[in-house]
Structures are given as structure tokens and as C-alpha cells.
């Protein structure tokens, strides 16, 4: 399958045999569209750790289906419960920053151990994992419904002229299950025929913006321009950005936001230029225990080779990785940074838009008080 073939409408799904879980290997996009089967917990952990799947909601859904796979493979073992619990712990450790992973795994694990018969455990695992996936689809749909009003307001203020939105990394359907978080309001605006254009940060070192967000927007026909990571401030200074919408891998209910490294710099530039900076997320991405994002959210450090090397398409169609850093130079690869609540204009959630503060968030989610 190549990237010119009709694309799947989701990045993860259950195969027709109801045993295999299938994913898009997002490392291969945009040049090749590769589908991978997941049948073991080791494969699930590799898919998450190596970023075949990525994005907080999708990581949570993948972890949930990982528990289903763990149950399936443990059915014939005498130590069924111990084995499943061990595998659940392994899945939760695949990546540290996205809070959805532990949330999804724990939900399915609880459903499994509410049953006594192994066959019922398997059915419960599949039902709960599937429910989580569908909930995230609906959450993202509603994020779009609530967020599009912000874009409509700017469009009216500009007399129908183009609304320019800047986004960072990929918080589209590839990072979720459908719709996306940051892209959901954009897609909804496009459906409403609002004149909209998206500035897409390339998002070094793995270029999720250039590779994935640009590919997504192109598939939908949404006008977009890929820019270098450091160009956003310049565009803001010259009135070429109307708003910023990003996703998040973990946000505290007090308003601090962990997202792909570079997000903090965009928030600083937006504040300096009086540009609204919104974070789109489902409630599953809130950490309801943490109160200080900078001090408490774990920041993943990935392989330095991701910084030292870059992949690209050769004229003959081959995808090759080349080194761009001197051999004797060290590299550091912090995957995320934390944007403090004071720089965030608001959260766009499935329940509505609110300010980035404890009282505002809890007003939307009173059951978390």
C-alpha cells in the first residue's frame, strides 16, 4: 500500500478475525502507507515506544487494545490473572508522558477482573477497549463543535477574510481515532465553508507536523503551509496568525500543559503578540492528581539519533535516513515541554471551552472536585 491509495479512516482498528489489532505505522507517512498487525504485548509496546502510534488519545486506545491482546494470549495459562497484570504494567511503562496510556490500560484491566470466567474476561476486554475508542471519537467530535465557534468569531471580526491558525506537531485524527483534537475545530470550520488556512510547524526532530499534519490536511483539502519551527514568532509579529491551537499529552487540571517540545515557545510568542493560544483535549488527557505541571509531569527523553538524523524521499522513491550532525557532537532529545497556565487562553474540551485554571476546569467537570 502506498500513500496514494485510499487511506484508512482510523489509525487503529480490530481486524476482521476479531483477534488482531491493526494500526497505521505513522513512521512511514507521508511517503508510504503501511499497515501493521499487533498480536503480542511486545508488539504493542514497540508500536507505542517507537511511535508507530503516537498522540495521547491514540496511545490510550492502543494501550486499551493491548490489554485485550494480553488477555487473549494469557487464556491458556494457569497464572492468568498474574500474567495479565504483569503485561498491563509493561504496557503502561511504554511511554511516560501521555496520561491516557495508564488511564486506558487501567480501565480495561478493571473491566477484565470484574469477571470470573476467562472467556468473559476476553469479551470484557474487547468491549471496554472498543468503548474507549468510540468515546474518544465522540469526544473529539464535540471538541470540534465547541471549538469552531472560536474560529467563526474571528472570521466575523475579519469580515470573512482568511482565518490563519497555527498548530504544532500533530493533534489530528492520526493522534486520536477520528477528527483529532487541535484539528477538530479546523475540520468543522472547513465543513462550514469558513475561509481557513493552517500554518503547520514542521516539528523537529521527527517532523510530525510536516509529515503527518500536512498529510492529513492535504487529504481533507484544507489549505495549509508547512513552516520551520522557528518561523511562528515572525508570522505573529507581522499579523499573519489569528490564533494558535495545539493538542496536549498531559495537562493538569490547574492549567499547565505538556505537549510536543516547542509548544512553550509558541505560547510565549503568542502572548507577546496578543494572539489567543488554545489547547484542545478530551477529559482523558487531564491529570486530575497533578497540580504543578513543571514540577510533576515526567518529560520523556528519546534516542538522540532522532536529532542527529533525518529521513527523506530520494528521487528514485527510496526513503533514506541521513546524518545531519557531526559524528563527535552530542545531542539531547527532550520530547515534550510544559506551558504554564498563565500563557494558555483556554481549553477546548468535549464539554465546552473554559479558562486554563482550576476553578474553570472543575466548573466543566464538577465530578472531579
From Swiss-Prot:
Annotated EC: 5.3.1.23
Named in its record, the pathway it takes part in is:
Amino-acid biosynthesis; L-methionine biosynthesis via salvage pathway; L-methionine from S-methyl-5-thio-alpha-D-ribose 1-phosphate: step 1/6
Q: In Gene Ontology terms, what is a biological process of this protein?
A: L-methionine salvage from methylthioadenosine
Going by the entry's taxonomy, the superkingdom of the source organism is recorded as Bacteria
GO MF assignments? S-methyl-5-thioribose-1-phosphate isomerase activity
Q: What does this protein do?
A: Catalyzes the interconversion of methylthioribose-1-phosphate (MTR-1-P) into methylthioribulose-1-phosphate (MTRu-1-P).
Family note: Belongs to the eIF-2B alpha/beta/delta subunits family. MtnA subfamily.
PANTHER family in UniProt: METHYLTHIORIBOSE-1-PHOSPHATE ISOMERASE (PTHR43475:SF1)
The protein depicted here goes by the name Methylthioribose-1-phosphate isomerase
* Taxonomic lineage: Bacteria, Pseudomonadati, Thermodesulfobacteriota, Desulfobacteria, Desulfobacterales
